[in-house]
Amino acid sequence: MKIVSGIYGGRPLKTLDGKTTRPTSDKVRGAIFNMIGPYFEGGRVLDLYAGSGGLSIEAVSRGMSSAVLVERDRRAQNIVAENIRMTKETSKFQLLKMESSRALEQVEGVFDLIFLDPPYAKEQIVSDIEKMAERDLFSKDVMVVCETDKSVELPEEIACLGIWKEKIYGISKVTVYVR
């Protein structure tokens, strides 16, 4: 795996072997950014289930100012930290080593781009978006990108957000919510 485009484009990303994380493939990651960008002029990213950190690092590579990455698995945390170091711009990234629910209670400010790829997709995505809405963590132009199995049906609306785009890539479905 590698960063697809932007200032870190072509740099390799480390991933975990096994079933601890399900890294988004380069092809799907590229497609996600073609849906939502493909490039940005600043903004904050929240990656609530970071895995390897590839989505947030790609977002910063393409112009986002900074990213907060949340990961609970210790082995995955080490991979995320290595991938952040690879950028040589570690000050743009903050790794929170905790459960997503705890992170949602602690993060401050608003986010412009949020990635949700939880292990138990539908229920967790709905709960996470509702919690973020309660805490007012969405910028006025927020995009929430949800990656699930293609069989998962997410609600048309959750809290203050509605589906903007939805596409299937192989076994994955990408759903983008906006205000």
Segments from the language model and where they lie:
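Class I S-adenosyl-L-methionine-dependent methyltransferase catalytic core
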Residues: M1-R179
